Amino acid sequence: MEKRIAICPGSFDPITKGHLDIIRRAANLFDEVIVLIMVNYTKTNTAFTAAERVEMARRVTADIPNVRVDYYAGLLADYARQQGAGGNAVCWGKTNLPH
């Protein structure tokens, strides 16, 4: 059977308890969850650098064995294809849904 991969993309500036809840839920449903720290070009004043956000995400997800954290500055679709996750899932939080 093909590995089921979920990507949880976001700027995670900072990562919150809400983000972590979504990540944990995804980890229960998928074989692998990638927390993808991305660049949000509409956010010009970030509180933390990309490296700091990656480190924070790694720390708070360290106890979840099927989660890994990565950084990507390109398009989500390109990253998903590179990871072999093109046909799998993307996790979105409620704030990302249209009102």
Where are these regions (language model features)?
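Nucleotidyltransferase catalytic core that binds NTPs
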Residues: M1-H99
